[in-house]
Amino acid sequence: MKTVLEIHGLTKQFGQQAILQDLSLTIKEGDIYGLIGKNGAGKTTLIKIITQLLFADKGTVSLFSSQEENEWTKALSRVGSVIESPVAHNHLTAYQNLKYYCMIRHIPNADKVIHETLDYVGLSDTGKKVFRDFSLGMKQRLGIAIALLSKPDFLILDEPINGLDPIGIKEFRLMIQRLNQEKGITILISSHILSELYLLANRFGILDQGKIIREISKAEFETLSEDYIVLKTSDKERACQVLKEQIQLQFKVVNPDN
């Protein structure tokens, strides 16, 4: 499986404050990668470095195996992103906002692309309603629509479910899963809401105090999350027999000599 993003030893400081410290992570093609961390952990700073809105003090970032400056611009053309909040014009409709971005990106067959994109994100019936009057969920969907115009291979979303109501969160989740499964887009999503990332992602990076302290798969995550009972006994053989034959529980002997 190809590597979409690989980061090694990334460090970023603002003044004397270390925001990212020797951070490393890997995202493979087809992943929905959940970047989990509390507010202030460095998620947005990391995403801005990946998209070259900020530059690291140390470390390497490889995007689609590109590290050199002349390759990086081409690699970034394969990336769509919504960072912090969607960038759209308040007094334009959804269609007009996409038309504007098609013009500045020189996207051919703009009208067809716009209608297909609006339909895909569920905004085809917004009519003359302008962005200023959109609900938060609609604004997030328009932000994703703008990111999708260039048909990206890699989509980066920074805290996209903040402030959404339960229905909006569910609709967002289904849309992201469709993008991944139907269009094959690799996706990086940051959030501080672990319960929602768990329902979306297949791999997780846990960010704490500027470091990725662990990268785990969903299967590993589920194993770590299992409830268990620690049972101490002086009669190991009898306890194993009861658990297996009478209670029919899965168990593991972790200290056979004691």
Model regions: which residues?
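Short, solvent-exposed coil/turn segments
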Residues: 20, 28, 224-226, 256
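Short, charged/small-residue-rich alpha-helical element at the C-terminal edge
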Residues: 227-258
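Conserved beta-strand-loop-alpha-helix hinge in the C-terminal portion
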Residues: 211-234
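A generic structural signal for secondary-structure junctions
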Residues: 64, 106, 205, 217, ...
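Short, flexible turn/loop "capping" segments at secondary-structure junctions
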Residues: 55, 220-224, 253-256
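A structural detector for beta-sheet-dominated domains
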Residues: 8, 28, 231-234
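ABC transporter nucleotide-binding domains
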Residues: 5, 12-23, 27-189, 194-208, ...
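Primarily ABC-family ATPase nucleotide-binding module
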Residues: 1-3
